[in-house]
């Protein structure tokens, strides 16, 4: 998110960035994955050639860039990243803090898109936001690599101050039970079509530049008022939420 990053500069050394996959001119009003943009994953090959694969620890990506405005990966994009990472022995990490636990109609967006990463980070939905909790899922090979030391040694040298917090764990287990018992992931898939139809009904309204429904999420771009970026969105929030 450029406007966020420019306030703080580069926080982590040795990090390269792939091109943003969103192009309104080519993707506007797409439902689900846009058709255009899979080729942008090939930029990873240039980065590998520049630095050598042995110096690249991992590729980290959100299957759906949420905070930037609900920007789903183009069709075939994640598959290309997976293939390039496999070709060069690079780990692929999915940040599913937002997309995990039903928002995309599945436990994880990785399942929806049929692409298996080496690691998944998650939070938020694991407790339905009731109590802060997060975690990481890893492939068995990665797990085994950390478990080769003696039993008395710390398996993953990391901060443990709040690990396995009893309240957070109880909230997480209860939430997962509800997801399973009430079939909420399947229900999200069932409602997805209605959600997209309702969102796209706003297309003809003035100042609507783009609508991007995917799963039970949607991003809507509104034309800015002159000299007041964000004001139109705030007014829409006030009128649509606080007044109703």
Where in this protein do the model-derived segments appear?
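Conserved N-terminal phosphate-binding loop of PLP-dependent enzymes in the Aspartate aminotransferase
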Residues: 1-244
């Amino acid at each position: 998110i450029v406007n966020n990053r420019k306030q703080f500069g580069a926080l982590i050394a040795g990090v390269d960035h792939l091109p943003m996959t969103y192009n309104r001119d080519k993707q506007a009003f797409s439902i689900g994955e846009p058709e255009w943009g899979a080729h942008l994953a090939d930029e990873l090959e240039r980065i590998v050639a520049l630095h050598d694969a042995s110096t690249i620890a991992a590729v980290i990506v959100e299957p759906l860039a949420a905070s930037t405005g609900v920007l789903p990966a183009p069709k075939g994009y994640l598959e290309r990243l997976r293939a390039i990472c496999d070709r060069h022995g690079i780990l692929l990490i999915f940040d599913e803090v937002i997309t995990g636990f039903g928002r995309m109609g599945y436990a994880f967006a990785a399942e929806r898109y049929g692409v298996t990463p080496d690691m998944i980070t998650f939070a938020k939905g694991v407790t339905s936001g009731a109590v802060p909790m997060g975690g990481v899922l890893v492939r068995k090979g990665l797990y085994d690599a950390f478990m080769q030391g003696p039993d008395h040694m710390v398996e993953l040298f990391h901060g443990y101050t709040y690990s396995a917090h009893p309240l957070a764990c109880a909230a997480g287990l209860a939430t997962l039970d509800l997801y399973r018992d009430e079939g909420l992931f399947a229900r999200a898939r069932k409602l997805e079509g209605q959600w997209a139809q309702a969102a796209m009904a706003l297309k003809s309204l003035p100042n609507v530049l783009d609508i991007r429904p995917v799963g039970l999420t949607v991003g809507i771009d509104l034309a800015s008022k002159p000299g007041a970026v964000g004001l139109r969105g705030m007014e829409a929030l006030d009128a649509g939420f606080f007044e109703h």
